[in-house]
Structure formats: C-alpha cells, structure tokens
Regions:
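A short core secondary-structure module
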Residues: 101-102, 113, 117-163
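Internal helix-loop-helix
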Residues: 12-81, 125-131, 207, 250, ...
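Glycine-rich beta->alpha junctions and the first turn(s) of the following alpha-helix
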Residues: 160-255, 324, 340
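Glycine-rich phosphate/cofactor-binding loops in nucleotide/flavin-utilizing enzymes
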Residues: 33, 37-38, 57, 199-206, ...
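Short, charged, amphipathic alpha-helical segments
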Residues: 240-244, 272-278
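A structural signal for short hydrophobic beta-strand segments in well-ordered beta-sheet cores
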Residues: 103-107
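A short, Trp-centered hydrophobic/proline-enriched beta-strand micro-motif
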Residues: 81-89
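Single conserved hydrophobic/aromatic residue that forms the stacking wall/gate
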Residues: 1-11
Length: 347
C-alpha cells in the first residue's frame, strides 16, 4: 500500500490524479483524452497508479449526481491522494443479476440514519480501502430495481469486517465484506434515496471502458515480441502470424475503447459502447496472455523461485485475466446490454 500512496502523492503534486476534473476539485480542467492516456500508461507500466474506483468510478458519478457537500468532501480527498475506494455491488447470490441485491439499508427518518446489514463479495482492494460506495435496499419489501440506493460508507466504521479471498493467481485482492449495523446518513446517498438503480448503472459505464486491458495487453505483447526476438522465435511463421494478428486486434479494441470514452463525454445516456469496448478489450487481452503463456509454456507451469520475474508475471497475469470476462459485468451481460439498449432487441 505504501508505494501506491507515495506514487499518488507524486502524481497529486502535478495535479495528474484526475486531470479532466474541474480545477476547483483538484483537477486541471483538461479534456478526457489526458485521463485516457494516463490510465493506459499506468496499466502498461504495471504501475499502481491512481485509485481507479475513486478517480474513474465514484468520482465521475459524484460530479454528475452529487450534492455540493459530497463534491467538496469526497472529490477533493480523491485528488489529494488521501483515500482508496472500493465497490460494494456483488453479493453471494447477486452478481450479474445486480438488481437482486438484498443488503438492507434501513432508513430512520427521525435521526436521518441508514443502518446497513448484509454481505458483499469479490470486493477488490476492500482490505486496503478507506471508503466504499455500496448498493443497498433502502425501501422495505421493494423488488428488483426499485427501492435501491447508492450509499457511501467509511470502511473504518463500526460493524465493517473484511475477509480476504485468495484467488487462483495466489493474490488476495478480492474480499468478502460483512456489514453488521453499519450506520451512515442520507447526506451520503448519491442521487435520491430509494432511486439509486440508474445511478449505479451509470457508474458501471465509467468502469467498463476497458482501457486498463488495453495497456496490459500492449505491455504483454511488446514483452513477448522482445522475448521471441531474443530467443530466435521471431522468424517462425506461426509466431509471426500470431503476433501480427494480435497486434491488429489490439489496435481495433483500442480504437473502440477510445470511442466509448469519448461518447460518454458527449451525452448522459447509458449506451452500448462501453459494453462493446469491454468485451473487445478483455477478450484480446486474454488471447495475448494465452499466446505468451504458450510461448513460455515450458518455463511457467507453477509458481517457484527458479522462474524469472518476466515468466512469473506472465503466469500470474494469465491466470488473473481469465476473470476479465466476469469482472465489472460478465461478457454475457454486456451482450444483453448491446442487444437491448443498442439494437433495440426484446429481452
């Protein structure tokens, strides 16, 4: 965590944490292209970079839906690099079907208190986070999309317990977060109380650009191409064809990702382009890492101390990026969004 925070402090001093945000909230007032380039570069360099949950998800959502109090409090602490955010959406029985969340947020109008009880899972960086944006059911007996609220809580509040979940790549970036009588107030609700569904969906559009996968894919492809050159594999016809094909597909996904991010700045509608770019970016990233893994297959079958850092990174990333078609909304859900919202097809 310390290197991440130290890096954020350096970026903060140059006001590059959120360059496209208004100056009053610590940004530079630049166009979205600066933020895109920055995110892609951080991913390419495998750098901890910015807090993507804060800078690219809840931050833009607060800018769009938040109150003056929320903007002043939460946006400035993000651009000062003081906090790490995490996302509280998925539950043990509510993943792709997000509207089925059951975590309760009982609202007491007398003392303006929301009492939260429930369990969230697959919470990336929950063990490091200072704050969480969480989707809860604040209207008793409500069903599906109705009666939901997007609420901000402090991870140090009484009643918040974080349990790490170890994944196949050996890391524990995912967590289970148990919430037992966690209290917050309506001033920490983004948008209107009980009407958070569309706010929560709009937030996902900020997440689903796929720009990180572009940076990671570019880095892996450059590295494996260098490896092939150094080990006399580059003249192999199959290797050359695969490298060329992957490079072309990556560039296509990159253009789609840029387009999706640009369209998001032009209108407020929840559209299909972020879903399209997420599918393309995650799938090409998986293909690139599969290719790299196959090239190195004799060297990277298990984690052990005899492997060089490059081989270890390829293996770890290959195992992790398999989840790209699940994280942030499954590929199947993205295809449904494209069909229904983009092409007007029936459910």
């Amino acid at each position: 965590l310390r290197p991440r925070r130290q890096r954020q402090m350096c970026i903060r001093d140059s006001k590059w944490i959120a360059p496209s945000w208004p100056k009053v909230y610590g940004g530079l007032g630049e166009d979205i292209s600066k933020s895109i380039i920055l995110s892609e570069t951080f991913a390419y360099r495998m750098s901890p970079g910015n807090d993507r949950f804060g800078v690219r998800m809840i931050g833009p959502t607060i800018l769009k839906y938040g109150t003056d109090y929320q903007k002043e409090k939460f946006l400035n602490e993000i651009t000062r690099g003081e906090v790490q955010w995490c996302q509280g959406y998925s539950e043990p029985n509510s993943g792709s079907d997000l509207a089925s969340v059951v975590t309760k947020g009982d609202y007491n109008e007398e003392n303006d208190t929301i009492t939260i009880n429930g369990v969230k899972v697959w919470t990336t960086l929950g063990h490091r986070a200072d704050r969480m944006f969480i989707l809860v059911r604040t209207l008793p007996d409500s069903n599906r999309h109705h009666g939901l609220s997007l609420v901000l809580i402090d991870m140090k509040d009484p009643g918040v317990k974080v349990n790490p979940i170890k994944n196949i790549s050996g890391s524990s970036s995912f967590n289970e977060v148990v919430l037992n009588n966690v209290k917050t107030s309506s001033k920490n609700v983004i948008g209107k109380l009980h009407e958070g569904w569309m706010v929560a969906l709009d937030l996902l559009n900020f997440e689903r650009s796929g720009i990180d996968y572009i940076g990671w894919g570019e880095r892996c492809l450059d590295d494996i191409e260098d490896y092939c050159k150094k080990n006399n594999l580059i003249e192999n016809e199959s290797v050359k064809n695969n490298l060329s094909s992957l490079r072309a597909s990556l560039e296509s996904a990159k253009i789609m990702t840029y387009k999706a991010l640009w369209i998001k700045t032009q209108n407020d509608e929840i559209n299909m382009e972020p879903s399209m770019s997420k599918i393309l970016a995650t799938e090409i990233n998986i293909k690139i890492h599969d290719f790299a893994f196959n090239i190195l297959s004799k060297k990277v079958t298990i984690f052990d101390d005899s492997q060089d850092s490059f081989s270890k990174r390829i293996l770890k990333n290959r195992l992790f990026f398999v989840s790209g078609g699940i994280l942030g909304g499954t590929t199947e859900i993205q295809k449904n969004i494209i069909a229904q919202r983009g092409l007007g097809l029936p459910r």
